[in-house]
Amino acid sequence: MLKIIENLSEKTAEQLYDFFSEKPSGLYVLFALLDWTGVDGAWLQSIDSDVTALVVQREQSKVYVTARENADFYELGDFITRLGGMVIHCPADITERIGMTAFSKISLMCIEKEIESPRKSVEINDNLRPVFDLLTQSKQKILTQNPNVKLREVKKYTDRAYNEWLARTSRGIFNGYTSVRAIKQGVNAILSVAVADRLKSSVYIRDVATDNDFRRMGYATDCISGLCSDFKTQGEMAFLACNDLKTENFYKNLGFETKEYMDLGIIEI
């Protein structure tokens, strides 16, 4: 039976950790629950006294699902259908079992090999605007190149997006589960950044970026390997999600291995 999780807090994901931490897909869904202020609803499925599945509905019509082998998959599919018009993220091995049609795939990759780290990163807790600008560098460039988009509209868009990103990131830093690390040159120049969330002994690297000019010089590998290596020291398991083959192969060269695939799709009525 599925029941709503009442009184969500930053402790909710931690309380469910032991049930869903065996596989990267379970952790991926738990990290979707970690930023609980952006969650529109969360439900647990249990059979007798055994917790079998977790459903998390987030902003922008996204649903994250993880389930154990003894879950009631028919109930899961029927329930998600009733949520209506959602893009579903679920482990590839349960896609058909909940009646979902997949249209895309992401790979969950874990650090398995020792990463050589010629560049050391530093942790950043304040003045995060340069971090955000680097993470969104390519998107802002696309906007500014569009002749139909005025510069003031780009600034308005990026300022609003920054405030939303800052709210989530600073909240995570304040609550002790988010770390922002950077490769710096000199005092102010940031060459590469990464943002990761931490839940017990697991670390989810959710955002990585390297300055465009610096990347063209061929230093992205050195920077990102340093960032990932430093995050690995914060937990027993460090993983990230890739949504294309080129990125997946890039991280394989850094010492990551693909452990599991998540399907993105919909349940057609």
Which residue stretches match the model-derived regions?
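A structural microfeature
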Residues: 52-53, 189-192, 220, 260
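A conserved beta-strand-loop-helix scaffold within acyl/acetyltransferase catalytic domains
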Residues: 57-58, 145-209
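Conserved active-site alpha-helix within GNAT-family acetyltransferase domains
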Residues: 93-103, 221, 244-261, 268
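Conserved donor-binding loop and adjoining core beta-sheet/short helix segment
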Residues: 21-81, 192-206
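Conserved acetyl-CoA-binding loop-helix of GNAT-fold acetyltransferases
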Residues: 71-79, 210, 216-230, 253
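Acyl-donor-binding surface of acyltransferase catalytic domains
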Residues: 52, 57-123, 265-267
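Short amphipathic alpha-helix that is part of the acyltransferase structural core
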Residues: 1-28, 111-163
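Conserved GNAT acetyl-CoA-binding A-motif
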Residues: 82-92, 231-243
